[in-house]
A protein has these predicted regions:
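Short, structured beta-strand-loop surface elements
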Residues: 3-4, 8, 74-135
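A structural signal for short, well-ordered beta-strand segments and their strand-loop junctions
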Residues: 45-47, 91, 163-165
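A generic structural signal for short beta-strands and their flanking turns/coil linkers
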Residues: 42, 66, 84-88, 112-116, ...
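A structural signal for short, well-ordered beta-strand segments
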Residues: 61, 118-120, 162, 166
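Short N-terminal helix-initiation segments at or just after the protein's N-terminus
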Residues: 4-10, 32-35, 53-67, 99-113, ...
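A generic structural motif
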Residues: 68-72, 162-163
Length: 243
């Protein structure tokens, strides 16, 4: 028999890089959970260092398989340096609730988050860049790339698309109610509660220069006012890329 078991393809191997240390039972390493947290988000934060100084850039992103993609201005310092094969850490956080406890120590937040690690690189193939730019639009608005004009040469030149293979990652979640010290429930007369937090889609405000006769495209049918943003992004992701 082999000395070690083969790596589980459905999980990220736990290492010193991705190990969840604080409240480790909240850690998640299975790819299904990590992918779900990523696919429900619109914005990520990309952390990196340039000449020993730390930076963290918020940007829209999306996932295709085990790769993450984002875009930026070709003149951006962040993009220029990421283009050199810079190690990066990509994070996503969803805030699901604010938790009021009977001590400051136990006040908390319900959340879902991901830390993903890899090396950023620029997409240089023109056809691949165009494909990804369409996917960037369709990831949020399914089918929209077929309804709008394609980017012109100046826009292509001004935009850099970055990609990163997820080399390793971990997720973390808190999804419970108030959790106080047992003696505090009876001894501390402080009102305690959990406030759910959600982002929702509102009513659309149409462009004042809309051409006459245009109606909302079929691909926007899921954009119902009051729909949770994270749930909507999961739906639009699956419509564009599948389950």
């Amino acid at each position: 028999m082999p000395d070690t078991l083969p790596a589980d393809p459905d999980r990220f191997e736990v290492s010193e890089v991705n190990r969840v240390r604080r409240v480790h039972d909240r850690g998640r390493y299975d790819k299904a959970t990590i992918h779900a947290f990523l696919d429900a988000a619109v914005v990520c934060h990309i952390a990196y260092t340039i000449d020993g100084r730390p930076y963290c850039t918020p940007t829209a992103f999306w996932r295709e398989g085990e790769h993450l993609y984002w875009h930026g201005s070709s003149a951006s310092r962040a993009i220029r340096n990421q283009n050199k094969g810079l190690p990066v850490c990509v994070t996503v956080t969803h805030v699901d609730a604010l938790v009021m406890a009977r001590s400051g120590f136990h006040h908390s937040i319900n959340y879902r988050c991901v830390m993903a690690f890899g090396t950023a690189h620029a997409i240089t193939d023109r056809a691949e860049k165009l494909r990804l730019m369409d996917n960037f639009v369709d990831r949020i608005y399914p089918g929209r790339s077929k309804l709008i004009r394609q980017p012109n040469e100046q826009e292509l030149k001004a935009t850099t698309l970055m990609g990163m293979e997820i080399e390793t990652a971990s997720g973390k979640i808190r999804d419970k109610h108030v959790a106080d010290e047992e003696e505090d429930y009876a001894a501390v007369p402080a009102w305690s509660a959990l406030y759910p937090v959600t982002q929702v889609i509102g009513e659309p405000s149409e462009c004042a220069r809309q051409l006459p006769g245009l109606t909302r495209p079929e691909g926007m049918a899921d954009f119902v006012p009051g729909t949770r943003l994270d749930e909507l992004m999961t739906v639009t992701y699956r419509k564009t890329f599948g389950a």
